[in-house]
From Swiss-Prot:
It comes from Paramagnetospirillum magneticum (strain ATCC 700264 / AMB-1). The lineage of its organism: Bacteria, Pseudomonadati, Pseudomonadota, Alphaproteobacteria, Rhodospirillales. This is NAD kinase. The active site is at D44. GO terms for molecular function: ATP binding; metal ion binding; NAD binding; NAD+ kinase activity. Pfam families: NAD_kinase, NAD_kinase_C. The gene is nadK. Its cofactor is a divalent metal cation. One of its GO terms (cellular component) is cytoplasm. Involved in the regulation of the intracellular balance of NAD and NADP, and is a key enzyme in the biosynthesis of NADP. Catalyzes specifically the phosphorylation on 2'-hydroxyl of the adenosine moiety of NAD to yield NADP. HAMAP family: NAD_kinase. Its EC number is 2.7.1.23. It catalyses: NAD(+) + ATP = ADP + NADP(+) + H(+).
Length: 255
């Protein structure tokens, strides 16, 4: 791939801002709104922020790690950037779209690149009913919470909650409970990526629940619908020797 106009964006850390200054001195660059590729300098959190920021542009984003976690980032090097971009492999992600309805009647809609999670707000456990494509699959789940993860997000919160790591292109999503009390032995499910999942919050007044799509939170929800948004393409670029598919496989063999 040959790119004619590059933009740089950076997290608000000293390391990221210092890298930004050096790279902008070294390479011709334009404003992000005019670029045909964006270089994101930071960690995974900043990469998610950048993907959300430019979601309507479908501009490829190439991350370089200047943060603490860099699963979604390439190795930081200042030299040879143009050549690296020309050899980079493209990964297209489709985010989840969350539609949440709160107790006050407010409708909250947001995209999630990693996962949509439902979490109890108080000492009371959450009590949920789960519908998949209109059919009740679990009439009552008592838990601290539950999440629906994309393949790209399966190594994040999902993995910490003991959910499965999913290869890119598998065409599935992970439904993973968080500290399930009843049914105690339920460990979640793998769903087709086309599935529409609806969570109904039972006893919502007594057991308040929040819903979070990446970093957009809705409090006191009573119903949450989640499904993949195939109309939204998020384009990421990775070095061939360390692409996202390879990282997901490697993550499964870490000690």
């Amino acid at each position: 791939m040959i790119f004619s106009s590059i933009a740089f964006v950076a997290a608000e850390t000293e390391a990221a801002k210092a890298a930004l200054a050096r790279l902008e001195q070294r390479y011709p660059h334009v404003d992000p709104g005019e670029a045909d590729v964006i270089i994101a300098l930071g960690g995974d959190g900043f990469m998610l922020e950048t993907l959300h920021r430019f979601v309507d542009r479908r501009v490829p984003i190439y991350g370089m790690n200047r943060g603490s976690v860099g699963f979604l980032m390439n190795v930081y090097r200042e030299h040879g950037l143009i050549e690296r971009l020309s050899k980079a492999e493209e990964v297209i992600l489709h985010p989840l779209r969350m539609k949440a309805r709160t107790a006050s009647g407010e409708e909250v809609e947001a995209l999630a690149i990693n996962e949509v999670s439902l979490l109890r707000e108080t000492r009371q456990a959450a009590k949920l009913r789960i519908r998949i494509d209109g059919k009740i699959r679990m009439d009552e789940l008592i838990c601290d919470g539950i999440l629906l993860s994309t393949p790209a997000g399966s190594t994040a919160y999902n993995l910490s909650a003991h959910g499965p790591i999913i290869p890119l292109g598998a065409g599935i999503a992970a439904l993973t409970p968080i500290s399930a009390f009843r049914p105690r032995r339920w460990r979640g499910a793998l769903l087709p990526h086309t599935a529409k999942v609806v969570f109904e919050i039972l006893e919502a007044g007594k057991r308040p629940v929040s819903a979070v799509a990446d970093y957009t939170e809705a409090r006191d929800v009573v119903e949450v619908e989640v499904r993949e948004d195939r109309t939204c393409d998020l384009v990421m670029l990775f070095d061939p020797e360390h692409n996202l598919e390879e990282r997901i496989i490697t993550e499964q063999f870490l000690p």
